[in-house]
């Protein structure tokens, strides 16, 4: 569904014309999202051996790649043997559950370990402030490592170009995915209760209550008391007009944020699954795949699994829609780019950079997009392979949610040096509300006070 439109079925436009128009509108309405390049929508891209780069210059080296079990790691892993054939560089991989990975990686980096050489990362401010991340501008400017015409940064979504930039213009990461919080619906479950697609938060609550049964929750979202569970709830805060941090102070105890968390708690306490206070993203996804929840809000990247009949019992009745909004306001879902970084202590930095260049190139992105990965490239997003694997309706919803997102508010928290501490405090408060331990006002006021005290030291 396009912004401002009404659709009883909840479907979004899926024609090629409307899809391409959405790409352009994303760039026009939100400057951080890319316009289509003038040369058109090529379904192929120059192969790696067409680049003016000596891919074999680090043959024999081995780089360690670490990350979360995630659509990106699932898509890139099968292609790694091709990278080794191209470069002679071996890649050892270590992918873990996201919560486990994000908890262990900072400890490893803080100890000064030279591995992993390349890693998926989210707490950029912490990594940059502590010197864990290698600055990359110099690598992009070295002609022995980069062929600018072949890599073609103009093909990147504008968010992907702007997102990794630190305040001094240096970049310490390369974006590898694009995602925004998206509403997933089981159309049959809603139709059985004669419920239309909810558009506002109040409508979402009414619908979630109406469709909840003994065997199916009305809605599932993350509520675990840890920062990794924060993206859906942050979208509620942003959509109510709140923010996470402003001027180096935690502000999620504002009236707007408190109202947002109160609604989040009502949804999950009144219509959520049993035990939702322990839910992480994989619990949410599994409930939706198995038909145990009528609705869910989480990453747009779930679409690949949801639309896959081999993994999903609801593939044929699944719908994808824009993030809900407060009456009188537009939706502001949380968005982010997972990024990959080079360890500043790595002994194989140049080989690691070649890997990042290859992994995010046009040719590789077309391959991963055909597997359903929402990459950072316009050419990949507009490819038929991506729309087939990801689903046209899901792609349209994801683009609309990216368009509606506020990149600055997302970066303000993600790039804060103590983002992990802040996000943990936030979700402890949200969890207290969901579990009924405290009111939203008491929980968020206390959480904000603790976080601000910790920031001040």
Task: Cite the ranges covered by each PLM segment.
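Hinge/lid segment of periplasmic solute-binding proteins
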Residues: 44-57, 124-180, 205, 315-321, ...
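N-terminal secretory signal peptides
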Residues: 1-18, 41
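Extracytoplasmic/periplasmic solute-binding protein
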Residues: 161-176, 181, 202-250, 256, ...
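Short, solvent-exposed loop/beta-turn-alpha elements that line the ligand-binding surface or hinge
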Residues: 53-60, 137-155, 223, 240-261, ...
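Conserved C-terminal helix/tail region of periplasmic/extracytoplasmic solute-binding proteins
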Residues: 45-50, 57-58, 62, 91, ...
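C-terminal lobe and pocket-closing loops
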Residues: 130, 141, 301-315, 326-428
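Extracytoplasmic "Venus flytrap"/periplasmic binding protein-like
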Residues: 81-156, 188-199, 294-295, 311-312
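Glycine-centered hinge/linker elements that transmit conformational signals in sensory
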Residues: 207-212, 247-278, 323
């Amino acid at each position: 569904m396009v912004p401002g439109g009404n659709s009883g079925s909840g479907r979004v436009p899926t024609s090629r014309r409307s899809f391409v128009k959405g790409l352009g509108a994303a760039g026009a309405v939100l400057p951080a999202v890319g316009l289509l390049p003038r040369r058109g929508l090529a379904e192929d891209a120059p192969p790696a051996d067409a680049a003016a780069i000596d891919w074999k210059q680090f043959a024999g080296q081995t780089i360690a790649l670490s990350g979360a079990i995630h659509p990106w790691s699932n898509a890139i892993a099968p292609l790694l043997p091709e990278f080794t054939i191209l470069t002679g560089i071996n890649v050892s991989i270590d992918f873990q559950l996201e919560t486990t990975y994000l908890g262990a990686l900072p400890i490893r980096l803080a100890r000064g370990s030279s591995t992993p050489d390349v890693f998926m990362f989210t707490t950029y401010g912490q990594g940059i402030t502590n010197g864990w991340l290698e600055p990359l501008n110099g690598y992009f400017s070295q002609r022995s490592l980069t062929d600018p015409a072949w890599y073609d940064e103009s093909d990147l979504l504008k968010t992907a170009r702007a997102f990794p930039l630190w305040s001094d213009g240096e970049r310490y990461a390369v974006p590898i995915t694009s995602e925004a919080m998206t509403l997933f619906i089981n159309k049959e479950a809603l139709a059985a209760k004669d419920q239309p697609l909810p558009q506002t938060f109040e409508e979402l609550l009414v619908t979630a209550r109406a469709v909840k049964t003994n065997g199916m929750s009305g809605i599932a979202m993350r509520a675990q008391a840890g920062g990794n569970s924060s993206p859906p709830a942050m979208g509620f805060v942003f959509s109510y007009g709140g923010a996470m941090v402003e001027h180096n102070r935690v502000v999620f105890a504002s009236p707007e944020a408190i109202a947002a968390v109160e609604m989040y708690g009502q949804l999950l306490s009144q219509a959520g699954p049993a035990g939702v206070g322990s839910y992480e993203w994989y619990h949410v996804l599994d409930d939706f795949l198995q038909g145990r929840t009528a609705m869910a809000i989480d990453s747009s990247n779930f679409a690949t699994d949801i639309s896959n009949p081999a993994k999903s019992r609801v593939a044929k009745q699944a719908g994808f829609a824009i993030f809900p909004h407060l009456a009188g306001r537009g939706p502001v879902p949380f968005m982010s780019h997972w990024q990959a970084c080079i360890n500043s202590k790595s002994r194989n930095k140049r080989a690691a950079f070649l890997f990042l260049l290859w992994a995010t190139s046009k040719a590789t992105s077309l391959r991963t997009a055909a597997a359903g990965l929402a990459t950072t490239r316009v050419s990949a997003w507009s490819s038929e392979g991506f729309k087939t694997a990801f689903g046209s309706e899901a792609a349209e919803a994801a683009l609309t949610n990216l368009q509606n997102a506020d990149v600055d508010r997302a970066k303000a928290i993600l790039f804060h040096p103590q983002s992990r501490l802040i996000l943990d405090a936030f979700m402890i408060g949200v969890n207290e509300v969901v579990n009924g331990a405290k009111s939203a006002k008491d929980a968020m006021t206390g959480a904000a006070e603790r976080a601000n005290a910790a920031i001040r030291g």
